[in-house]
């Protein structure tokens, strides 16, 4: 919250690193901000159902909110998507007027007018690499090692699930060096 007060939403989201789904209500401006991490690790659902704004990290919380009102309608196109892709693509959910916020986006909601504005706050930059193979390997190693080291900072023991693939094996091998 101090970051929002000091820098505003755009600068705050530029500075935050990690997994998150956050909500900030600015009482003075009567604006609600909902934001999701860059990689989309933490989910964030939001809805505008009959003029009621709702949000939660799990869809079942929004279902529970409206269960006695019987106002949630199924979005049948989402079911078709599920049968086609075996998941419901973002931003859809199984309900009309309830959505999953995309990774690296935030939602600015003017509470007075119920106006929703979706803003992408981060873009993945793809840069051409002109390094030779050895330099490129070293850079990749250093970046992955730094990322793993940052995730190893915890106040409880850290465990791993191994799929047997290259990615999980690489992470565990690097973590064992920390």
Residues of each region from the PLM?
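Cysteine-centered catalytic environments shared across enzyme families
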Residues: 1-178
């Amino acid at each position: 919250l101090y970051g929002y007060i000091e820098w505003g939403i755009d600068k705050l989201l530029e500075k935050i690193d990690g997994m998150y789904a956050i909500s900030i209500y600015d009482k003075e401006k009567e604006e609600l901000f909902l934001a999701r991490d860059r990689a989309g690790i933490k989910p964030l659902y939001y809805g505008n159902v009959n003029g009621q704004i709702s949000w939660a990290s799990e869809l079942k919380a929004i279902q529970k909110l409206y269960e006695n009102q019987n106002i949630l309608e199924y979005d049948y196109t989402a079911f078709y998507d599920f049968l086609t892709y075996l998941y419901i693509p973002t931003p859809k959910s199984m309900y009309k007027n309830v959505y999953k916020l995309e990774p690296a986006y935030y939602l600015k909601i003017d509470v007075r007018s119920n106006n929703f504005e979706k803003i992408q706050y981060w873009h993945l930059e793809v840069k051409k690499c002109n390094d030779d193979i050895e330099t490129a390997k070293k850079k990749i190693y250093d970046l992955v090692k730094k990322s793993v080291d940052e995730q190893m900072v915890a106040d409880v023991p850290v465990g791993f699930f191994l799929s047997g693939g290259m990615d999980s094996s690489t992470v565990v091998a690097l973590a064992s060096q920390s």
